[in-house]
Amino acid sequence: MKKAALALLVLTVKLSVAQASVPQPDEKLAAGEHYTELAGVKFWYKVAGRGPVLVIQAPGWGVGSEYLRNGLAPLEQHFTLIYYDTRGSARSSRPPDEKHMTTADMVDDLERLRRFWGLDSMTLLGHSHGGAIALGYAIRYPKFVHGLVLVDSNIEDYDDGADRNREIAARKNDPRFKDAIASMTSDFDPKTDEQFDSFLKRVLPLYFYEPVSGLPRFAKTDTGPLPSVWAYHAFAAPDKPLMKEDGSLDRIEAQTLILVGRADWICPVAEAEHIRKGIRNSRLVVLDKSGHFPWIEVSERFFAEVIRFAK
């Protein structure tokens, strides 16, 4: 009898230790920085703010989430924001095989994180290629998306080359963009993170309606690790399969807000209009006097739209 009681006590202790070693839901979403390993990738994420959960989806080609964490901080007064670095970028680790740097891989990463965080469904905000990841997620996992905010987003398999070229041509005689266009049209094959960072800084004026005022404000938010040239080359590999999004937008069930700067050349208004036509429960807002980063150039209008939608 004593042996049985002792065995039961030992088992109880072991179970208690095992349970204590697994983060509980409230710990996983406690304010602060966290790491978790899922499917062979160690993800960094940060939780900040108060209110309903809003997951911030960063791009997946080598930049981290720092520019969003700093730039979108005013939303923390209204929402609990979860920021995370995508696989291979910033503080998250590389996948074992560089072939697994596709948008589809990142969509599945987000689903693993949703389950890990214990969220029944999410409101997602994706910027730029982060918007393409959010689109892919809402297509593949429509039941788990409560609301979708797409900010200057692209579509993974949409050919926007003509739209982009038209936007560049409209700026070619503007001295504010002369050096950026020259860099954009030159040979580009960075070998180091430093070279990649230098290139991005040279072309960055093109991403603003008014670079003279926009660039210094953006620089204050872009304080994270250097962009990863490894992630860029792995993501941009010519044989990398594209996720089929363009013909599947009608699978998205969530209410969707689409925001785009009228002066955005990389994710132009024409592409945003294409997204609106494909998602039945969507609304498009074109923001005047803004390029690719509307929270920098038209912050009051941008935050008002997001708060009104996501609340």
Regions found by a protein language model. Give the residues of each.
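Short beta-strand/loop motif that positions the catalytic acidic residue
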Residues: 252, 258-260
